[in-house]
Amino acid sequence: MLNLPVDTRGLVHENEVANLKALAEFLKETFAVNYAKGQQLKTSTTAKGYSNTALLDDDLKSYWVSQSKDPSPTIELLLEKPVEVNTFMIQEYLPLGQRIKSFSLEVLRNGAWEKVYEGSTIGNKRLVRFDTKAVEGIRFTVTDTKDRAVFSNMGLFKALN
């Protein structure tokens, strides 16, 4: 929801309109290419009847579920070739509740994993921004959860600076 003030004419000021158009263009360009699509995806575990392919199908009604015995569910994405990125996106499947308490994100560079972020809660969608790096892969690890991890979508993007 946007809280846009109107001016004395009852209109949104031209400067506000220009800023909104710039924001729309930024978002359109940032999320135009999901570098995760078509890449090798591995998960630490997958519950019976589910598939990790749900993470990249853009369908908010499909989802991946970790096994109940997995204390730190991990999603690993290995890229065919290094690509410059700076934004990771993950979405919990909220009809089953918000479950994630904390997580970490690592990038694979020159054959070694490097932690770039630690965070708490995800909810509907979490965008994690980090310094632009040419990466060979990413690893997302749930470090604390209320129940099994359940995610509907993920992505890897390059936002303009």
Feature locations, PLM:
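Short, surface-exposed beta-strand/strand-loop-strand elements in extracellular ectodomains
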Residues: 98-110
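Beta-sandwich interaction modules
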Residues: 115-149
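Aromatic/acidic polysaccharide-binding cleft in carbohydrate-active enzymes
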Residues: 1-18
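Active-site proximal loops enriched in glycine and acidic residues that flank catalytic Cys/His/Asp
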Residues: 2-6, 79, 92, 142
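Active/binding-pocket-proximal capping segment
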Residues: 18-23, 105-107
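Disordered, acidic Ser/Thr/Pro-rich linker "stalks" and the adjacent N-terminal cap
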Residues: 21-85, 91-99, 118, 122-124, ...
